[in-house]
Regions:
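Autoinhibitory propeptides
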Residues: 2-264
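Subtilisin-like peptidase catalytic core
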Residues: 23-49, 54-55, 70-81, 159-163, ...
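Subtilisin-like serine protease catalytic core
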Residues: 261-293, 299-348, 396-398, 422-424, ...
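Extracellular S/T/G-rich loop segment that most often corresponds to the catalytic His/Ser-adjacent loop
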Residues: 276-278, 284, 415-492
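Substrate-binding/access-modulating region of protease and related hydrolase catalytic domains
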Residues: 341-418, 476-478, 482-483
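C-terminal subdomain of the subtilisin-like protease fold in secreted/lumenal serine endopeptidases
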Residues: 498-570
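A short beta-strand element within beta-rich, extracytoplasmic domains
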Residues: 569-588
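Short coil-to-beta strand junction motifs in C2/discoidin
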Residues: 585-597
């Protein structure tokens, strides 16, 4: 076996950008016609009249552009609205119902709308008089048919004409977004209209002192406050989610094995943070757990509220002894356990508030396990508030969350639930002992293109349950809740014991799961993530005799944008050496491309 190598003290050097970008590109599948221009002019005029009639609570206006495809950044508006700076005015983006088209919301000044209507009129005149009312991509790119001489007698230049034509070729319609009313307490995200949220709430008719503000655009409202918001300014709502979440059910065998287990006292072992339901301090490993009850004393607690949280912490502390077939070679870990929920229902707002406080006050812990999740599916168009909060915390506090992929509450539930849509977290789905997807597993992706879950691990099934310690003894259970703690153990070993950066540790973990699989089927990726993480830590930090794996990391201070692929500041390179040749075949996970090295 070969150990993984980490290469240091060599900065990344940014290559010069060879491709300076293309010019104006029209949609090749659409001809722009006078009829379509007339429709868009009418729609923008109606929107202008709407905002003139409306008692606006802010300076400016909101317009949602329905594109006729999934619009790349280069295909979005660059002639209308604010011209080449229009992307800076984007305040919201989502998909249509069948996820085949983009709907992008812009925050504009009144003059932007007036100028856009005038531009469309001027383009219409030229299109009708010079090009018989129709423009195709072939004609637009023909210098003999579209040149500056033609525009000498018109108020707009050739470049403006081509920009607007290109814009219109990707636009289906203009609208003002009006969401459906949610009749319950909710977490609501408002569009950024460049106004202080407290002033905005007062204009809406809500007392800021009686509204819980989560951040600059997100608020927690009671059902009555939601009603007031939707009556007075529904167009401000970018996203609204019901606050009460339900914990998806776990599978378990309703029998306990009650026998005495002993465990040595903790010494210098690393500490993993656990945010879960309550913890029972009477269990055999309680000396390894520092427990903090965050649930209000006004909330009634039952004995069942201690089962889930205690079980999760038992895996982190002593999982390999309870499950010898899952001995990962990582040893034992201490736990700082924060009980933030009881029963099967909990408030998302309360969880968010507690997590912010917990992480801020416990910055000595780098790895955190969250096995709580919603029984509801994630929104196709938005990252959940819970996930967005985790993403922000991980960036600001230099920590990493391991999040359970959530279980099915019924056969109708297919997609993962919040906060398993967290982009920065390591999201873990469960597999059986044979490495197959379980009956309770839910699937990604997130926003149609973010690969979630990240990885899979053994979470138990009817063929082989996971053994945990609950208050009444050893219990046989199954669920994604019991897969994620094993990954938290491995990450803590890589970060707290080996001293790797969290980004490098995450990349190494994904690399170990992915193996030499170059192109994963999207359906496989949506269920298993990049693959099943090896059981033993040595299979992550070591490679086979014919492989060399090395890590490189740095901060990417500049970047180039490509149509396909992505760049990051971490690379995990695996080289397979073929003896007797002068080539090494290389594969870079999970943030780079395949490479071949010549000796």
């Amino acid at each position: 076996m070969n150990y993984v190598l980490e290469l240091k003290n060599k900065r990344f050097i940014q290559a010069d950008k060879k491709n300076k970008g293309g010019g104006i590109t029209m949609n090749s599948k659409v001809d722009v016609t006078v009829t379509h221009l007339d429709t868009l002019i009418k729609q923008l005029s109606s929107i202008q009249e709407f905002w003139q009639r409306e008692h606006k609570l802010f300076t400016g206006l909101l317009v949602s552009v329905h594109y006729n495809k999934i619009a790349a950044k280069s295909n979005r508006i660059s002639g209308l609205f604010k011209g080449i700076h229009s992307n800076d005015a984007v305040v919201g983006a989502k998909f249509n119902d069948d996820k085949s088209k983009h709907i992008i919301t812009y925050f504009l000044e009144d003059k932007d709308l007036t100028n856009s209507i005038e531009l469309l009129f001027q383009v219409r005149v030229i299109l009708n008089e010079v090009y018989t009312g129709r423009m195709s991509k072939n004609i637009l790119e023909n210098a003999e048919k579209v040149n500056s001489n033609i525009f000498k007698n018109y108020p707009i230049s050739m470049s403006v004409f081509k920009s607007v034509i290109a814009d219109v070729s990707y636009i289906e319609s203009f609208q003002v977004h009006q969401p459906k009313l949610i009749k319950s307490q909710s977490i609501v995200t408002l569009y950024d209209v460049k106004k202080d949220i407290k002033e905005l709430l007062e204009e809406i008719g809500l007392d800021p002192l009686h509204v819980t503000i989560l951040d600059d655009q997100t608020i927690y409202l009671t059902d009555t406050q939601v009603q007031v918001l939707f009556e007075n300014a529904a167009y401000l709502v970018a996203m609204a989610t019901v606050d009460v979440s339900q914990l998806p059910p776990d599978e378990f065998i309703d029998t306990y094995e009650s026998y005495r287990i002993t465990i040595p006292e903790p010494t210098i072992e690393p500490t993993i943070g656990v945010i879960d339901t309550l913890f029972d301090e009477r269990v055999y490993f309680s000396e390894w757990v520092e427990y903090h009850d965050m649930v209000s004393n006004d909330i009634e607690k039952s004995s069942l509220d201690y089962n889930h949280g205690t079980a999760v912490s038992s895996i982190i502390v002593d999982g390999p002894r309870l499950n010898p077939w899952l001995d990962d070679g990582c040893g034992r870990f201490r736990v700082r356990h924060f009980g933030v929920a009881v029963g099967k229902s909990f408030s998302s707002y309360t969880i968010i508030k507690n997590i912010k406080k917990i992480i801020a006050n416990n910055n000595d812990i780098k790895v955190w396990n969250i096995s709580l999740g919603s029984s509801y599916e994630i929104n196709d168009n938005f990252i959940s508030v819970e996930a967005a909060t985790l993403d922000r915390i991980q960036f600001e506090e230099d920590v990493i969350f391991v999040v359970a992929g959530t279980n099915k509450s019924s056969e109708d539930v297919i997609k993962i639930g919040a906060p398993a849509d967290s982009i920065n977290s390591v999201v873990v789905n469960a597999v059986t002992k044979e490495g197959l997807s379980t009956a309770y597993t839910r699937r990604g992706p997130v926003l149609s293109f973010f690969a979630k879950p990240d990885v899979s691990y053994y979470g138990g099934s009817k063929d082989a349950y996971i053994q945990v310690c609950e208050p009444n003894g050893v219990q046989s259970v199954a669920g994604t809740s019991y897969a994620s703690p094993w990954i938290a153990r491995k990450l803590s070993y890589l970060i707290d014991i080996l001293g790797l950066q969290k980004e490098v540790a995450k990349a190494l973990l994904i690399d170990s799961a992915r193996g030499w699989e170059e192109n994963l089927d999207p359906n496989v990726l949506a269920i298993y993530g990049h693959g099943i993480v090896p059981i033993h830590i040595n299979d992550i930090i070591q490679t086979k005799e014919d492989e060399i794996k090395f890590l490189v990391s740095d901060i990417s201070e500049k970047w180039n944008t490509y149509n396909y692929g992505s760049l990051s500041n971490v690379g995990v390179f695996t080289l397979r050496v073929f003896f007797g040749t002068n080539h090494m075949y290389g594969w870079c996970h999970s943030f780079c491309s395949k490479v071949e090295y010549v000796l």
